[in-house]
């Protein structure tokens, strides 16, 4: 089954999020543009959630960063209603496609200092097994 979960403490990335190189390496321009519209605390929460989402998506495709997949190849965008939408590119997209995935669904939640992201691969064909 194509399922991935990641959990972070809300402040776990604080030091890294203050570094421009980290933001540029990890986040797509669209993710940073959304975060720029928030105050400092909400931007930090938003970007931490996006990082957890990327980690959960990596687990879905069965690889990790450093295997030719970079964090920016997994962009967590927003639907018209604000829900997270996963956009894969590069090697991440090829791995998912080769596994038979049409895409990845993602949910991110923030509660009491924790961030949790749960992701699920969506099969390309109706009736296709998740195995």
Language-model segments: which ranges?
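Core catalytic alpha/beta fold that binds nucleotide/phospho-ligands
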Residues: 1-131
């Amino acid at each position: 089954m194509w399922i991935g979960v990641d959990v972070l403490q809300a402040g776990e990335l604080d030091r890294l999020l203050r570094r421009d190189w980290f933001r540029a390496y990890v986040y797509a321009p669209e993710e940073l543009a959304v975060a720029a519209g928030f105050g400092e605390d909400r931007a930090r929460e938003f970007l931490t959630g996006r990082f957890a989402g990327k980690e959960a998506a990596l687990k879905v495709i069965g690889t990790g960063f450093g295997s030719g997949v970079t964090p920016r190849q997994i962009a967590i965008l927003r639907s018209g209603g604000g829900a997270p939408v996963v956009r894969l590119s590069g090697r991440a997209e090829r791995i998912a496609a080769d596994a038979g995935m049409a895409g990845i669904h993602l949910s991110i939640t923030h509660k009491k200092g924790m961030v949790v992201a749960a992701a699920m691969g969506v099969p390309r064909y109706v009736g296709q097994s998740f195995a």
